[in-house]
A protein has these predicted regions:
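Flexible, surface-exposed loop/linker segments and immediately adjacent secondary-structure boundaries
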Residues: 13-18, 22-99, 106-230
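Short carbohydrate-recognition loop motifs
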Residues: 277-307
C-alpha cells in the first residue's frame, strides 16, 4: 500500500485553480442571472402594475331605449332580438331601426351611478355596431371615456354633456371605412350614406378622417362638413343657424312667467300653468335619467282642461326674420311618462307634449301658429282625432317613459306659400289635457341656407341646408 504523504501532490495546483475558477464563474453567472431575472420581474411587475392602475379600462354601462316603434338588436350570440322598451347593452351590439322607429343609446359611468357620459339618438333607417365603450378602471388614471361605433349607415344625433370631469371621445366608422371623431361637450349631427357623409358640429371639436388616414378635415363649432366617399373630397359650409340662444331647460334658463314685458328681454323660457279647475299643473327643473330637464306635471285625478306652458320669445318678442333661410326645422328632446286622455283629447288639441311656433306670415298678415303634438296612450274604442284643427300633420305616438328626439320636416314645405313664415316670434312647448307627466330637455330651431355644392357632390345643393 502506497500512501501519499502530501495530498496536494495528487492534485496539481493548476487543476485545482481551474476548477475553482469554473465554479466561481458558474456561481457568478447564477447570481447575475438571478439578479437580472429579479430586475426583469421588478420592471415587468412595475409596468404591469402601472398599466393596471393607469391604462386598464372597464366597460361603460350602456342602455338602449326605444323611443318609437321597435328596434333590432343583435348581441354577441348573433341572435337578433326585437326591442320595444329599454334594456342594457354590451360591446359588439348591432342596432338597427326601420322607417318608423327611433332609439337612444345612453352611456353611464359605472363608478358614478346616474352620471351620463353621452347620448346617441339613432334615427330612422339607421344601423350601427357598438364596437366598444370604456372608462379607466381607476380614478387616478388620466384616460377619458371612449365610445366606438362601426359600420354606420344612417343618421345620428350625439350629445356630450358639459359637466364631466373626464374627456369624452366618440369615434365613428362609416361603412366606407372613413372615420369621424367627436371630442368635448357639444351637439353633433351625422348622416352617412353610400354617396355622402355629413357631419355638423355645435359646440364641440370634430374631425373627418379618411379611411387610409392620409387626410384629416377639422370641423369647427357651427360648421358642417360633407365628404364624398368615392373621391374623398370634403366640402365645409356654415351649419344651419341655431335661432334659440341656450335652448336647454335648466335652472339658469327657466323662469316663472309674471306676464311683464321685461321678461321678454331675458334669454329664458317663461313658464306658467293654467287650468279650468283644480288642481293646477306644476313645473320643476329635475334630473331625469342623468339629464337636466323640465318636468310638467298635473295629477290629482284632474278631470278638467289644463296646460303647463313654456314660451321663448325671439329677439325680445320682436321676432327673427327668416326670409333669408331656405329651411326651417325644429329639434325637440322630450319624454312622456303618462297622460289620462286618449291620444290628444276630443278635439286633438290636448297632447301631453305639444310644440307651437308663433310667426308672422309673408306679406305682413295677422300672426298665426304652427302646431304639432305627441302622445303615448290611445284607446281604439274612443275615436278622438289624431290631428287638431290648426295642425298640418297628424300627431305622433311615441313610447311611454322613453326619451324621444323629434326633428321636424322643413316648416317652409309644410305650409302653403302664402302662409310661409316671414318672422318667428315665439317657440312654445307645453303639456295639455287633464292629467299629464312629461319632460322637456331642449327645444331648438334651425334656419339653413342652400349653398351650391362643387362637382364632386353632384347637382343637389339642397343637402347643405337640410336640418342638422
Amino acid at each position: 500500500l502506497h500512501i501519499v504523504a502530501n495530498p496536494a501532490a495528487a492534485f496539481p495546483a493548476q487543476a485545482v485553480t481551474g476548477r475553482s475558477l469554473r465554479q466561481q464563474r458558474v456561481a457568478w453567472g447564477v447570481l447575475l442571472g438571478a439578479f437580472a431575472l429579479f430586475g426583469v420581474l421588478c420592471i415587468g411587475t412595475g409596468l404591469g402594475l402601472r398599466y393596471f392602475l393607469l391604462d386598464s379600462t372597464v366597460a361603460l354601462q350602456g342602455m338602449l331605449t326605444v323611443g318609437r316603434g321597435t328596434v333590432g338588436l343583435t348581441s354577441t350570440d348573433l341572435i337578433e332580438q326585437v326591442v320595444r322598451g329599454s334594456r342594457e347593452i354590451a360591446n359588439s351590439s348591432v342596432i338597427s331601426t326601420d322607417r318608423q322607429s327611433q332609439a337612444m343609446l345612453s352611456f353611464y359611468d359605472p363608478h358614478t351611478p346616474g352620471e351620463l357620459v353621452a347620448t346617441i339618438t339613432v334615427r330612422t333607417d339607421t344601423a350601427l355596431d357598438l364596437a366598444a365603450m370604456s372608462r379607466p378602471r381607476f380614478e387616478l388614471s388620466g384616460l377619458g371615456y371612449e365610445i366606438t361605433l362601426n359600420d354606420l349607415a344612417g343618421r345620428l344625433k350625439v350629445i356630450i354633456p358639459d359637466d364631466l370631469t373626464r374627456e369624452v371621445r366618440v369615434t365613428i366608422e362609416s361603412q366606407a371605412g372613413n372615420w369621424i371623431t367627436l371630442t368635448g361637450s357639444g351637439e353633433y349631427f351625422l348622416e352617412v350614406s353610400p354617396n355622402l357623409e355629413i357631419l355638423t358640429n355645435y359646440g364641440g371639436s370634430a374631425a373627418m378622417i379618411a379611411a387610409d388616414g392620409a387626410t384629416t378635415q377639422l370641423v369647427a363649432d357651427t360648421q358642417r362638413a360633407l365628404r364624398n366617399p368615392e373621391t374623398g373630397e370634403v366640402y365645409v359650409v356654415p351649419a344651419p343657424v341655431s335661432l334659440i340662444q341656450q335652448p336647454q331647460f335648466t335652472q339658469a334658463t327657466v323662469i316663472e312667467s309674471d306676464g311683464t314685458p321685461a321678461q321678454l328681454l331675458q334669454p329664458a323660457w317663461r313658464c306658467y300653468s293654467v287650468a279650468n279647475g283644480d288642481p293646477t299643473g306644476d313645473f320643476n327643473i329635475v334630473r331625469e335619467n342623468g339629464r337636466t330637464a323640465l318636468q310638467m306635471l298635473r295629477g290629482g285625478g284632474a278631470r278638467t282642461h289644463g296646460e303647463t306652458l313654456c314660451s321663448r320669445a325671439l329677439n325680445a318678442g320682436q321676432g327673427v326674420d327668416v326670409t333669408g333661410f331656405d329651411t326651417l326645422s325644429l329639434d325637440v328632446l322630450f319624454k312622456i311618462n303618462s297622460h289620462s286622455l286618449s291620444a290628444c283629447g276630443i278635439e286633438g288639441s290636448e297632447c301631453p307634449v305639444m310644440v307651437r311656433v308663433d310667426y308672422v306670415p309673408v306679406g305682413g298678415g295677422p300672426a298665426t301658429s304652427w302646431f304639432h303634438g305627441f302622445f303615448v296612450t290611445f284607446d281604439p274604442n274612443i275615436t278622438n282625432p289624431l290631428v287638431c284643427a290648426s295642425c298640418t300633420q297628424e300627431h305622433e305616438v311615441v313610447n311611454a317613459g322613453a326619451w324621444y328626439s323629434y326633428q321636424s320636416d322643413n316648416l317652409f314645405s309644410l305650409l302653403p306659400a302664402n302662409a310661409r313664415p316671414e318672422a318667428i316670434v315665439n317657440v312654445v312647448v307645453y303639456a295639455s289635457g287633464h292629467e299629464y307627466d312629461s319632460f322637456i330637455a331642449s327645444a331648438e330651431l334651425f334656419g339653413g341656407i342652400r349653398d351650391p355644392l362643387p362637382a364632386p357632390f353632384g347637382e343637389s345643393g339642397e343637402i347643405a341646408a337640410d336640418a342638422p
